[in-house]
Design a protein with these regions (language model features):
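Intrinsically disordered, low-complexity terminal regions
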Residues: 1-228
Length: 228
């Protein structure tokens, strides 16, 4: 290398470092207002109090949390945990979630080929998984649960008795429907502290069941509610 070019290379190296620093993941933290994580950008933590959070298709972020607002994640996202208090959480296909997915008042849906490294839990709301792997537990107090075709829950599935110590819980007079779909697997126990109607597909595999009597089925979908 011509030594006369050394200063030029040094300047280029410093410029590259500066550019890398500018592109480093940044946190977004606000009290009021929605947050959107755009595809092609790297984000740190996403936090708001009053507002929704959106992760566009292909977006990358750390944990995303809000108090009053929904969380909507597109296809092929990668994030930390997703949590809200008042709002649902919806993730598209092939989501990679490096933590738990949790809400209090709202439903949770994880699309096909998703991966969740933590738990999937809500208090008032339904849970739906499609060909999704959950490393932890799946649980709710008041809501239907569908462990859809090809899903794999490595922890337990639990439906808890509502607690008077928490926020008011909407209690339906209808039994909750718990569906374990074709080819689905729940490694841990299935524990029910409330009356539920539990459907388990003939091709599914589940752990020990307590608090409910499973109803086997062999059709692509569970029997309609009219037969509950």
């Amino acid at each position: 290398m011509d030594i006369r070019q050394t200063p030029r290379f040094a300047l280029l190296f410093i410029a590259a470092l500066a550019a890398g620093s500018a592109l480093a993941a940044e946190d977004i933290n606000r009290v009021n207002g929605a947050i959107t994580a755009h595809a092609g950008s790297e984000y740190g933590r996403l936090e708001t109090v009053n507002g929704s959070i959106t992760l566009d298709d292909g977006a990358r972020s750390g944990d995303a949390s809000t108090v009053n607002g929904a969380i909507r994640a597109g296809n092929d996202i990668a994030s930390g945990g997703l949590s809200t208090v008042n709002g649902g959480i919806h993730a598209g296909e092939r989501a990679r979630i490096g933590g738990s997915v949790e809400t209090v008042n709202g439903s949770v849906f994880i699309g096909r080929d998703g991966e969740v490294e933590g738990d999937v839990e809500t208090v008032n709301g339904a849970i739906g998984l499609v060909a999704t792997v959950v490393a932890g537990d799946v649980g709710t107090s008041s809501g239907n649960v569908t462990i859809g075709a090809g899903s794999h829950v490595r922890g337990r599935l639990h439906v808890d008795k509502p607690s008077a110590n928490w926020m008011p819980i909407r209690i339906s007079t209808r039994r909750q429907r718990i569906i374990i779909g074709p080819g689905a697997v729940v490694d841990g126990p299935l524990e029910f502290e409330r009356e539920v109607t539990l459907y388990v597909h003939d091709s599914a595999r589940v752990g020990e069941i307590s608090g409910a009597t499973p109803v086997p089925y062999s059709t692509p979908t569970a029997p309609p509610r009219a037969s509950d």
